[in-house]
Amino acid sequence: MGLNRFMRAMMVVFITANCITINPDIIFAATDSEDSSLNTDEWEEEKTEEQPSEVNTGPRYETAREVSSRDIKELEKSNKVRNTNKADLIAMLKEKAEKGPNINNNNSEQTENAAINEEASGADRPAIQVERRHPGLPSDSAAEIKKRRKAIASSDSELESLTYPDKPTKVNKKKVAKESVADASESDLDSSMQSADESSPQPLKANQQPFFPKVFKKIKDAGKWVRDKIDENPEVKKAIVDKSAGLIDQLLTKKKSEEVNASDFPPPPTDEELRLALPETPMLLGFNAPATSEPSSFEFPPPPTDEELRLALPETPMLLGFNAPATSEPSSFEFPPPPTEDELEIIRETASSLDSSFTRGDLASLRNAINRHSQNFSDFPPIPTEEELNGRGGRPTSEEFSSLNSGDFTDDENSETTEEEIDRLADLRDRGTGKHSRNAGFLPLNPFASSPVPSLSPKVSKISAPALISDITKKTPFKNPSQPLNVFNKKTTTKTVTKKPTPVKTAPKLAELPATKPQETVLRENKTPFIEKQAETNKQSINMPSLPVIQKEATESDKEEMKPQTEEKMVEESESANNANGKNRSAGIEEGKLIAKSAEDEKAKEEPGNHTTLILAMLAIGVFSLGAFIKIIQLRKNN
């Protein structure tokens, strides 16, 4: 057990080591190139560079402030402006915008001027929005639009806000708030309608792109359209609000809920409604139920009278070929009177004619068929023959049964007798077979004979002799002689006694017993003892089979002669029993030794196998762990 546990633990360690070191290239990403080396500083730099990137869910437009700051940085880089004030730079850009658009200037300068004018107007609208809204307009119309915006920016307050963009005034704040609220929906719609090609959005990562942008765009447009429609129709908006408020009040008010629940269930019906709803009472046994004076929906009709039952029941059929006489007082539960003598004569004539129509073959075939069907039932009597039907036949009486020869009973070794069969035989001896035929359900009367037939007796079944002996001894008990012999012992009865005892004289104690005639015993091979003839059941005793009949009490001399024989038999039996027990014990000891030896052999065979598997597992673990260690050292050197 200890080796098995150790082996399991080593296997667990081996599996975990394989899971860690089976492919170290995946974990450490070991390559020979310098670019892919394990430098943690480079990874941190990449992370810091990726952090400022923002998620771009659509086209992004630069504000005027961002455009102006970007233009100033570009001018400083190009060495055009050095050590200048921000206010002077803005004034210079404003003067360029007042002179009008210059076609020779590049697109970047035009966008810069437009962004400055947009900032002067005080609104956070995109600088390139006009050109994007109307891409087909000529440059002259775009210049006119710019001039209009420039005229709006001529107020002193706007110039102050332009000079100090970081500190806007209160008037500027209010104006910007109003314009931003007014143009919020328009700017959102315009920004969603712009294409990705015209804008310059920042590149997004693959894992940060929006999911189904077209679907989200359509949902947003639909929501905006619904909101606009509701704002245009205040009546619809008011109706929606009122409806929702009414539903909430109806759900939260307890009184309203109780009224709704009460309205769902109708009131219970009254007795009159139930009586009208129930169908009429159906006809019972062919007559209508009488109408009650006080109708009720849960009342049963009264029971019928004798006259109603007599009229409802059919007429009494013919019984045994004659009609029942009409009685003066009709009753539904009255049997017909017994037949008269004339009717009995008619029955006998018809029975004799029917009896003559039957043949022997018909009765034999009928008896065979019934025997085949009733062979599974031991208590069912066999079909009687023609002689038994016409009269008593070969049914034995109690005296004939007692005087039967022992050879008439067939006795086999496998035959068994139950208590029911013994009781049946006793009844046959005393009272005949009437009780048996009644229990079996056989009809004692014969409809085909002119006179009643007595009860029929079944054929005597096979029965063992000892059971019948015990039954007869119950009826006529007798005293057994006091001798040490065991008469019914199976071991002693199998051996034949060669020495015959001498006849003894009658003792005075057994003088009252009836005198019996000694008879010769007969031995049969492979069969149990049989019964000898009985002349009269109350006057004759039973002779024991295969043993001498002892009619008198044994004297002391006889007892002394019988003692050696019994002692020899008992010694032989004890010796044979001891020999058998000794053999059984020795056989059991040998079997136990063989089982122990086989278990030791199997254990010895299993031990080398366990050792070999353990050694192989440990070798495999060592090889894999060594390889993993070498690989880790190489990776550390490369880093």
UniProtKB/Swiss-Prot annotation:
Its main location: membrane. Residues 190-210 have a biased composition (Polar residues). Residues 62-71, 423-433, 553-572, 588-609 have a biased composition (Basic and acidic residues). Sequence repeats lie at residues 264-298, 299-333, 334-378, 379-417, 418-422. It is a single-pass membrane protein. GO terms for cellular component: plasma membrane. It comes from Listeria monocytogenes serovar 1/2a (strain ATCC BAA-679 / EGD-e). It comes from the Bacteria. Residues 36-71, 132-212, 285-308, 320-341, 372-459, 474-610 are annotated as: Disordered. Pfam families: ActA. Virulence factor required for host cell microfilament interaction. It induces actin assembly around the bacteria to allow it to move within the cytoplasm. It is involved in the actin polymerization process. It seems to act as a nucleator that induces the reorganization of the actin cytoskeleton. Residues 450-459, 490-509 have a biased composition (Low complexity). The chain crosses the membrane at residues 613-633. Keywords: Cell membrane, Membrane, Repeat, Signal, Transmembrane, Transmembrane helix, Virulence. A motif (Cell attachment site) lies at residues 360-362. It is found in: Cell membrane. Residues 1-29 form the signal peptide. This is Actin assembly-inducing protein. Residues 41-52, 409-422 have a biased composition (Acidic residues). Residues 264-333 are annotated as: 5 X approximate tandem repeats, Pro-rich. InterPro entries: Virulence_actor_ActA.
